[in-house]
Regions:
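Positively charged, low-complexity terminal tracts
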Residues: 1-145
Length: 145
């Protein structure tokens, strides 16, 4: 079977209530660096929220073997990020602190994961983050077209 590199990602960024942006980024290194930059900015924004739990999941819908899940605990400052990485049923769980080293580690995991996604033939990506109880909550949404 022929391997297909992801052509582009459509990003929906909901930074505040009633503020939405839609940007297309290509599946090159600049595109992924841009996505990671948005994630970093979003994480900093989450630090200002005092009450909600956040889950960020990044997975290929047609292949559930590769999934990254980040759980942000409900504290004013982010205490830890729980990371579960399931790659072909090899599940690893990490607790990492919300400091610059953690973001570098998170970035490396995402970059590795993106490389895995390139192996999918017809992968649909859904990058979804936000607060479950409030539809107007901040969030970053990525859909592969």
């Amino acid at each position: 079977m022929e391997k297909k590199i992801l052509n582009n990602l459509k990003m929906f960024y909901h930074a505040k209530s009633y503020l939405k942006g839609k940007i297309e980024v290509f599946s090159d290194i600049e595109g992924y660096n841009y996505i990671i930059k948005c994630i970093e900015e979003y994480v900093l924004m989450l630090k200002n929220n005092l009450s909600a739990k956040y889950t960020i999941s990044f997975k290929g819908k047609c292949n559930n073997k590769s999934t990254l899940n980040f759980l942000f605990k409900d504290k004013g400052e982010l205490d830890t990020i729980s990371l579960t990485y399931d790659k072909t049923h090899n599940i690893e769980t990490f607790n990492i602190y919300a400091n610059i080293e953690s973001y570098k580690f998170l970035k490396e995991c995402l970059e590795d994961f993106v490389e895995d996604l390139k192996e999918f033939i017809h992968a649909e990506l859904n990058f979804d983050s936000g607060i479950n109880v409030d539809c107007d909550s901040p969030g970053i949404y990525f859909y592969h077209l």
